[in-house]
A protein has these predicted regions:
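Conserved alpha/beta-domain cores
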Residues: 1-167
Length: 167
């Protein structure tokens, strides 16, 4: 029911208000089957990918998203990589546990996390699809932001207070 309301609101924004530059970003798509179901439900509610320029972007924030990136991209127009969740779920830790516990090991620059992110970027670039990143990592680590640019990321979301530090 809530999803139907969200779709109705998006339809109104795009059709009635003419804001066709507004796109849909779908979070936490766990499986290919779930991607199919979400796309199908949206279509039944009047939001069809490609219709009136509608782009569907998937949050790539679960290791399975990176592992099966090529298959997920069959259903979406690109990824926004959620580096916080990708790091937590790849390393099996919680960044909010307190620095004295597990959070001290929370680092987007860990080789396993970089592998997942690079795999996701490469899949998007190979298919000529959008790829951006959101999360704390590029704001906290200028070297990570530079690495992302070298890998071909399309956009990087930064916290406003860190723009000067990463300049």
């Amino acid at each position: 029911e809530a999803f139907a309301l969200e779709c109705a609101a998006m339809k109104r924004v795009r059709e009635d208000m003419g804001l066709t530059n507004v796109e849909i970003m779908v979070p936490f798509v766990r499986t290919i089957k779930q991607a199919e179901r979400v796309i199908d439900m949206m279509a039944k509610l009047g939001l069809k990918r490609g219709e009136n320029g509608l782009r569907l972007i998937m949050m790539c924030e679960i290791p399975s998203n990176a592992i099966l990136a090529d298959q997920f991209l069959e259903y979406f127009d690109g990824f926004s990589i959620g580096s916080n969740d990708m790091t937590q779920l790849t390393l099996g830790l919680d960044r909010d546990s307190g620095m004295e516990l597990l959070a001290i090991d929370f680092d987007e620059r860990d080789p396993a996390v970089l592998f997942m992110i690079e795999r996701s970027i490469d899949a998007c670039l190979k298919q000529n699809k959008y790829v951006g990143i959101c999360g704390q990592g590029p704001s906290d680590h200028p070297d990570f932001a530079r690495w992302l640019v070298k890998k071909g990321i399309t956009s990087i979301s930064l916290n406003p207070d860190s723009v000067v530090a990463t300049w």
